Amino acid sequence: MKEKGLIFDIQSFSVHDGPGCRTSVFFIGCPLQCKWCANPESWTKKKHIMVAENVCKWKNGCRSCINACSHDSIKFSEDGKLKISWDTCEKCETFDCVNMCPNNALKQCVKEYTVDELMTILKRDFNNWGSDGGVTFTGGDPLMHHEFLVEVLKKCYDSQIHKAIETSGYAKQEVFLEVLKYIDFAFIDVKNMDREKHKQGTGVYNDLILSNIEALKKSNWNGRLVLRQPTIAGYNDSDENAYKLIEFMNKNSLYEINLLKFHRLGETKWNQLGKEYEYSKYGDMTNEKMEHLQQLYLDNNIACYIGDNTPF
């Protein structure tokens, strides 16, 4: 199998990404560009770097990265900050700057794995999972590597490994259904039921996502599906949005949703990528508001979990 997957992180002992203790595999590349994203390094499928300016030693005269870069992509601006020319940086294949940095201020965001290399890691972690754990494929969005992912899923099936996925659901329907037929447990995000607001916050309309969920429910798939919503004040926290989602869930016999309280844990990553994070001063969701939304779902016979307080 020559297909390779582009992965930016693998985390063992994950306990909030599906049933039991799991290994989470983070694929690079996402068809959405959510303005609040906690993993903005996952957006592009191109290899790239991140810069931790707080540990960079340029003030002490270090120029290791500049001297190592063969694309002339790294410079210091007049205000003394490290500046990356991303257009030329993303063409790099060697990442000499990362290897030469003595302070680990530069990080390569992606690594290539073959199917066998990834399976070696999963089999290594197998005994850590217990009877109800397994692997969760997340990202980014793993559907962007569907050919590689299907090969991994087949080998997981042969090895009796429980398989979960976290996905936006934004993919061609044949790709979506082909991958999901191998999945035991799925989280699918529904950011907003209003298609214009969905595009405003994520860069894409929600039509394809909703139609894929409907198609999955009409198929003979027998896995467990939990919808997820990152809940953001002023964007998707209205009763109107909740009732529209409740209507959609009841129509499609969906009975579980996980509301995730908005956080800013990804802000540092935005800075390290040279991107502006417009949600840095955005209002927090109160516990009272989260509980109010939860009650709306409960009143309509839908199990609603807040954050990590889940039965899985």
Curated annotation (Swiss-Prot):
Record's keyword annotation contains Iron: yes
Keywords linked to the UniProt accession: 4Fe-4S, Iron, Iron-sulfur, Metal-binding, Oxidoreductase, Repeat, S-adenosyl-L-methionine
UniProt-recorded Gene Ontology molecular function terms: 4 iron, 4 sulfur cluster binding; metal ion binding; oxidoreductase activity
Binding site for [4Fe-4S] cluster 2: 56, 62, 65, 101
Claim: Phosphoprotein is one of the keywords in the record: no
Residue positions binding S-adenosyl-L-methionine: 36-38, 140, 189-191, 263
Family: Belongs to the organic radical-activating enzymes family.
Name of the protein in its database record: 4-hydroxyphenylacetate decarboxylase activating enzyme
Origin species: Clostridium scatologenes
